[in-house]
Amino acid sequence: MSDKPATPTKHALEDEDEFEDFPVDSWPSTETLKAYKEGDSCLWEEDWDDVEVEDDFTKELKKELESNK
């Protein structure tokens, strides 16, 4: 037996080791951060709170909010 320490072997990159290329997102220009910063767009849905939810928690919360006005 030899007294040399074992040297690690280097493996070539396999196809599966490479990074996957993802397609570029094609956002409408009105929905980009640049349009938002320039004031041309609103990234939030304007009617996000228009949804009526009628569960017990919501009813109790509305009642509490009305009493605190």
From Swiss-Prot:
Xref: SMART domains: DSS1_SEM1
A GO term for molecular function: molecular adaptor activity
Region entry Disordered, spans: 1-26
Keyword annotations from UniProtKB, A to Z: Proteasome
Record flagged with keyword Nucleus: no
A Gene Ontology biological process term: proteasome assembly
Record's GO cellular component terms: cytosol; proteasome complex; proteasome regulatory particle, lid subcomplex; proteasome storage granule; transcription export complex 2
Feature: compositional bias, Acidic residues: 14-23
Top-level taxon: Eukaryota
Keyword flag rRNA-binding: no
Subunit structure, as described in the record: Part of the 26S proteasome.
Known role: Subunit of the 26S proteasome which plays a role in ubiquitin-dependent proteolysis.
Protein family membership: Belongs to the DSS1/SEM1 family.
Identification of the protein by name: Probable 26S proteasome complex subunit SEM1
Organism: Eremothecium gossypii (strain ATCC 10895 / CBS 109.51 / FGSC 9923 / NRRL Y-1056)
Lineage: Eukaryota, Fungi, Dikarya, Ascomycota, Saccharomycotina
